[in-house]
UniProtKB/Swiss-Prot annotation:
It comes from Shewanella baltica (strain OS155 / ATCC BAA-1091). It catalyses: alpha-D-glucose 1-phosphate + ATP + H(+) = ADP-alpha-D-glucose + diphosphate. It comes from the Bacteria. Belongs to the bacterial/plant glucose-1-phosphate adenylyltransferase family. Homotetramer. The keyword Nucleotidyltransferase applies. Its EC number is 2.7.7.27. Alpha-D-glucose 1-phosphate binds at Y107, G173, E188, K189, S206. SUPFAM superfamilies: Nucleotide-diphospho-sugar transferases, Trimeric LpxA-like enzymes. GO terms for molecular function: ATP binding; glucose-1-phosphate adenylyltransferase activity. The lineage of its organism: Bacteria, Pseudomonadati, Pseudomonadota, Gammaproteobacteria, Alteromonadales. Pfam families: Hexapep_GlmU, NTP_transferase. Involved in the biosynthesis of ADP-glucose, a building block required for the elongation reactions to produce glycogen. Catalyzes the reaction between ATP and alpha-D-glucose 1-phosphate (G1P) to produce pyrophosphate and ADP-Glc. This is Glucose-1-phosphate adenylyltransferase.
Length: 420
């Protein structure tokens, strides 16, 4: 099946800016050495691959990736996996690190991150600027957002989705809209969100994806830069300041294809990160990584196929209901309902269940592991038991999440740190 995507005048006139500088502090030690957008997901990808793939699949070929916090692995990944675009054809994916272009400060907020790159955006001469969050895993055709923005005559359009009020409280920007989806009110991360029309248990939450007419965006950023009391944030400052006098609309998040449920996940906690990976193991997952109509692009390492060795009664190498990536060796061990990233080795007589195992992990013999996240490069000592007794896990120095997922990192195992 062909997966060629075609550009339109709207996408051709659009420059996308992905904000990828966040740490993701609720992921604790998992982001000690990498920015959240550089975090692994789905067996072989990183979170940044999803908004980037959405851009390419939507026909948007000019993209800037804004980086700040511990960005080395993110920059390296984007350069390796996304450097094949042809500038002479108007295609590019560029890295935009914090570089104190307009002041001695680093990026102070989401709006400031865009403001400090105005000269780079202006050089591209876009009619529209799309500002995207690099923190979420989702599949979205931005062409629909562009079409709705142009048709409505909006100055700014905010992508939104309905989420439970309890989930949105303190975590999402929440908006009020009229019957035409014009935004009438906006609060950034309220503790008591206002509910959606006709649905007292749900609210309309911002996805952190914004579309602007370029000159309108520049005008608002310049005004905000002169406001000494501003937090330099789109949700806290820019949107509340413009909704009364300008055309600001909401765009409901939709699937990239008709008759399919839209997929969006906030993987900002250990539990949500673990759960989103576990969902991929379903026979018909909400996010189908095997859909050729909407491929997820990434850096393709040259690795040998996964291998499963030994077939004795007491030592059988096998994986059931799992994702096992390139370079993995399951040597006389059992893996069930788990996601194994590249070059993981599970040695004889070990059992790994319901776990997310990041690249380069080695599980030595006679280990028992369940409901765990093993960070990149961990070497699990022979005979270690993880996830069966939370008190014992904590005594070993591991972190146990609210819902009982155990995080293990190299530092917790006394190994040299710095894996990204």
């Amino acid at each position: 099946m062909s997966n060629v995507r075609y550009t339109s005048n709207l996408t051709r006139e659009t420059y996308a800016l992905i904000l990828a500088g966040g740490r993701g502090s609720r992921l604790h030690e998992l982001t000690d050495w990498r920015a959240k957008p550089a975090l692994y997901f789905g067996g072989k990808f990183r979170i940044i691959d999803f908004p980037l793939s959405n851009c390419i699949n939507s026909g948007i070929r000019r993209v800037g990736v804004v980086t700040q916090y511990k960005s080395h692995s993110l920059i390296r990944h984007v350069m390796r996996g996304w450097g094949h675009f042809k500038k002479e054809l108007g295609e590019s994916v560029e890295i935009l690190p914090a570089s104190q272009r307009y002041s001695e400060n680093w990026y102070q907020g989401t709006a400031d991150a865009v403001f400090q790159n105005i000269d780079i955006i202006r050089h591209e001469l876009p009619k529209y600027v799309m500002v995207l969050s690099g923190d979420h895993v989702y599949r979205m055709d931005y062409a629909g957002l562009l079409a709705a923005h142009a048709e409505s005559g909006a100055d700014m359009t905010v992508s939104c989705l309905e989420v439970p009020i309890a989930e949105a409280a303190g975590s999402f920007g929440v908006m009020e809209v009229d019957e035409e989806m014009r935004i009438l009110g906006f609060e950034e991360k309220p503790q008591q969100p206002k509910h959606s029309p006709g649905n007292p248990e749900m609210c309309l939450a911002s996805m952190g994806n914004y579309l602007f007419n370029t000159e309108f965006l520049f005008d608002q950023l310049k005004k905000d830069a002169l406001n000494e009391s501003s937090d330099r944030d789109f949700g806290k400052d820019i949107i509340p300041a413009i909704i009364e006098k300008h055309n600001v609309f909401a765009y409901p998040f939709k699937s990239a294809f008709p008759n399919e449920q839209a997929y969006w996940r906030d993987v900002g906690t250990l539990d949500s990160f673990w759960q989103a990976n576990m969902e991929l193991l379903s026979p018909t997952p909400a996010l189908n990584l095997y859909d050729a109509k909407w491929p997820i692009w990434t850096f393709q390492e040259q690795l040998p196929p996964a291998k499963f060795v030994f077939d004795d009664d007491d030592r059988r190498g096998m994986a059931l209901d799992s994702i096992v990536s390139g370079g993995c060796i399951i040597s006389g061990a059992t893996v069930r309902r788990s996601v194994l990233f590249n070059e993981v080795r599970v040695c004889s007589y070990s059992l790994v269940e319901d776990s997310v195992v990041l690249p380069d992990v080695v599980v030595l013999r006679h280990c028992k592991i369940k409901n765990a996240i093993l960070d990149r490069g961990c070497i699990i000592p022979e005979g270690m038991v993880i996830g069966y007794n939370h008190d014992h896990d904590r005594a070993k120095g591991f972190r146990v999440s609210e819902k009982g997922v155990t995080l293990v990192t190299r530092d917790m195992l006394g190994l040299p740190v710095g894996y990204e």
